[in-house]
Amino acid sequence: MKITSEEPEIHWTFLKVKDKVVLDFGCGIFYSQQATPDWFLKEGASKVIGVDLGNDKPNHFIYHQKPISSREDILDLVHEYKPDVIKCDIEGAEVYFSDITADDMKSVTQFAVEYHDNDLKLLMDKKIKDWGFENSDTHQLFDEDIDRIGVIYAWK
């Protein structure tokens, strides 16, 4: 599986985060480029919770250093923070959202997930509708030789 990175101002600009609580799975804290929590804060998010594996301990947003390897890992944070916005960019973690219910997602008004497989894209499209999101859009990332990688944006 190809691990990708992004420029937040290109890949996540569809998320309107001003005055919102953002739960950022795969926040990129260990990359040398800008981590997405910094960008969300610059865009006016009221609180950002970043989740990743890096060792840095930022003091300007809430950081959880933990792997996301199950539905429960996601739900623990969703229930604790009740985010308005969820962004997930963890290669392979898309599948853990498949068992999450509409009730679990009731606080979430915007959802963005990077997918790395066309079957997972179809699964996420279905889940987004099941969760009650009224609108969604898909954007392919990178170039045509990586056509199975993209982002699904959804909003209520």
Say what each PLM segment does.
Residues 1-51, 54-80, 85, 117, 124-126, 131-156:
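S-adenosyl-L-methionine
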Residues 8, 34, 71-72, 95-98, ...:
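Structural motif corresponding to alpha-helix initiation and N-cap regions
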Residues 2-5, 68-72, 92:
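Conserved phosphate-coordination/catalytic loops
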Residues 60-62, 81-156:
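Conserved acidic-Pro-Pro-aromatic motif
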Residues 28-35, 56, 91-97:
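Short acidic, Gly/Ser-rich segments with clustered Asp/Glu that frequently serve as metal-coordination loops
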Residues 11-16, 73-81, 99-103:
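Short amphipathic alpha-helix with an adjacent loop that forms part of the alpha/beta core around
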Residues 27, 53, 66-69, 90, ...:
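Hydrophobic pocket-lining residues within nucleotide cofactor-binding pockets
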